[in-house]
């Protein structure tokens, strides 16, 4: 089967080079060299990725992936979708967040009775 597939690919490339105009004959048409599997097995060759740091991404289901991220962290967790949780888990998470959601009491502002004229003598030149 693989010999048949490679023969068909060769015939297709030969047919494409004859049918294509002269300027398009030198285009890279083979897909077996630069597919996604090869790209994932090699290192990053570009200098534009020099400032990306390797971190561990934790998904909602608990699975982990090593990715590159612009900020230096060790672990990055994805937020949990509250709609997918059971009602008991949702209530437990809400109870945890209740302390953070409470409004802080605002302190009354102090009355400002500063008089500029009283201290003006200290910064004027004589």
Curated annotation (Swiss-Prot):
Pfam family, one: Mitoc_L55
InterPro entries xrefs: Ribosomal_mL55 (IPR018615), Ribosomal_mL55_sf (IPR044884)
GO process terms (BP): translation
Residues where Phosphoserine is found: 86
Any single Gene Ontology cellular-component annotation: mitochondrial large ribosomal subunit
Protein's cellular compartments: Mitochondrion
GO molecular function terms attached to this record: structural constituent of ribosome
UniProt keywords, alphabetically: Mitochondrion, Phosphoprotein, Ribonucleoprotein, Ribosomal protein, Transit peptide
Transit peptide: 1-34
Superkingdom per UniProt: Eukaryota
Family statement: Belongs to the mitochondrion-specific ribosomal protein mL55 family.
PANTHER family: 39S RIBOSOMAL PROTEIN L55, MITOCHONDRIAL, LARGE RIBOSOMAL SUBUNIT PROTEIN ML55
Assembly and binders: Component of the mitochondrial ribosome large subunit (39S) which comprises a 16S rRNA and about 50 distinct proteins.
Protein name (Swiss-Prot/TrEMBL): Large ribosomal subunit protein mL55
Gene source species: Bos taurus (Bovine)
Lineage, uppermost ranks: Eukaryota, Metazoa, Chordata, Craniata, Vertebrata
């Amino acid at each position: 089967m693989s010999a048949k597939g490679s023969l068909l690919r060769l015939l297709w490339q030969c047919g494409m080079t004859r049918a294509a105009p002269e300027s398009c004959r030198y285009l890279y048409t083979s897909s077996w060299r630069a597919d996604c599997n090869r790209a994932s097995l090699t290192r990053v060759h570009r200098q534009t990725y020099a400032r990306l740091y390797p971190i561990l991404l934790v998904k909602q289901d608990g699975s982990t992936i090593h990715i590159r991220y612009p900020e230096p962290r060790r672990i990055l967790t994805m937020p949990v979708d509250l709609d997918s949780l059971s009602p008991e888990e949702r209530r437990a998470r809400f109870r945890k967040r209740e302390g953070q959601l409470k409004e802080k009491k605002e302190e009354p502002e102090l009355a400002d009775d500063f008089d500029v004229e009283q201290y003006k003598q200290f910064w004027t030149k004589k």
